[in-house]
Design a protein with these regions (language model features):
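Catalytic cores and adjacent binding grooves of peptidoglycan-active enzymes
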Residues: 20-25, 29-30, 34-45, 57-72, ...
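N-terminal accessory beta-strand-rich subdomains and adjacent acidic, glycine-rich linkers
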Residues: 10, 14-141, 145
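Active-site acidic/histidine clusters and adjacent loop/turn architecture
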Residues: 119-190
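Gram-negative bacterial Sec-dependent N-terminal signal peptides
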Residues: 1-3, 9-12
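Acidic, glycine-rich low-complexity/disordered segments
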Residues: 185-201
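Generic hydrophobic secondary-structure signal
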Residues: 80-94, 98-105, 171, 175, ...
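General secondary-structure edge motif
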Residues: 112, 151, 155, 200, ...
Length: 292
């Protein structure tokens, strides 16, 4: 060491270098695909996801004793991650916390979207069900039906996955209070005929299990749609391009009701391009990313 070199400055210099090394390592980790999403799952489901790790350049998470790889959004068992092209990605996206403007597509983009709809109808996408099945302990119909519960939500009896019991209890309590102070909400709830939950079925037109088949989704079904569109696929029988249907012509859930569900971990299908305005899906990992 040079005579008179201050030890404090040396320590500060070494500390700064170490901090830069940590920051650079963190940057590299965050830059790898899937890091944000894997961490969101771990934050949203701490009772099921034991740990996350970088292994062989891939973000992974562990449920019980099994590791699942990000695998370009497919979330595959470690032994199958090289086959990611055989499967569709699990829906993970930037969810808007306010009602987004309608999509405005030029003719080229519109043509691509029309072709995508045709392609999906001809060759339905198929997700690997292993991750959600293990996460929810609902890999088969029999296993799923051992995990569902019947409960009351806003005056209706609904069957859902047991993980939804607490958040839906809070939803019901908040809606009960809201209907006393908000006439629009009271009228909306009075206009419902049922709330549907668990239903072991596949997404319409695909080979993938619906989130209803895990008991993770509920549909608020009205007595009448009043001539409005609630679902993009139904709208296609009336309009050429479903995404152009203005909000005024869609059956809509009042914003205060949507906010109650969102506060408790649910995303609303009314904010999707492929809209489903009656549909709420328990996706706390998506809301975690939206609020980062």
């Amino acid at each position: 060491m040079a005579p008179g070199f201050p030890l404090a400055e040396l320590a500060q210099s070494v500390g700064a270098a170490a901090a830069r090394t940590v920051e650079e390592a963190q940057f590299k980790e965050d830059a790898l695909p899937g890091g944000r999403e894997v961490k969101a799952f771990a934050a949203a489901w701490p009772e099921r996801i034991a740990e996350t790790a970088l292994r062989d350049g891939e973000w992974m998470l562990r449920i019980d004793e099994d590791w699942f790889a990000w695998a370009n959004g497919r979330l595959l068992p470690d032994s199958e991650r090289s086959r990611w092209e055989d499967y569709a990605a699990l829906p993970l996206y930037r969810y808007p916390l306010s009602l987004p403007p309608l999509a405005v597509l030029d003719e080229e983009a519109a043509a691509r979207l029309r072709q995508r709809v045709r392609d999906d109808a001809a060759n339905p996408p198929r997700r690997h069900e292993g991750f959600l099945g293990r996460l929810l302990q609902a890999g088969s119909r029999a296993e799923t039906e051992g995990r569902v519960v019947r409960m009351e939500v806003a005056g209706f009896t609904v069957t859902v996955h047991e993980r939804l019991e607490q958040p839906l209890t809070r939803v019901s309590e908040e809606l009960r209070a809201l209907r006393l102070t908000d006439p629009a909400v009271a009228g909306f709830l009075k206009g419902l005929t049922e709330i549907n939950g668990y239903n072991y079925r596949f997404v319409e037109g695909t080979h993938s299990r619906s989130f209803h088949s895990y008991g993770l989704a509920v549909d608020l079904v009205p007595k009448s749609y009043g001539g409005r569109h609630a679902y993009w696929m139904w709208a296609m029988s009336k309009v050429r391009d479903f995404w152009t249907v203005p909000y005024e012509r869609r059956w809509m859930v009042p914003a205060p009701v949507v906010e109650v569900f969102e506060r408790n971990g649910f995303v609303w299908g009314g904010k999707w391009l492929f809209f489903d305005t009656m549909h709420f899906e328990y996706r706390p990992e998506i809301l975690f990313m939206a609020r980062e």
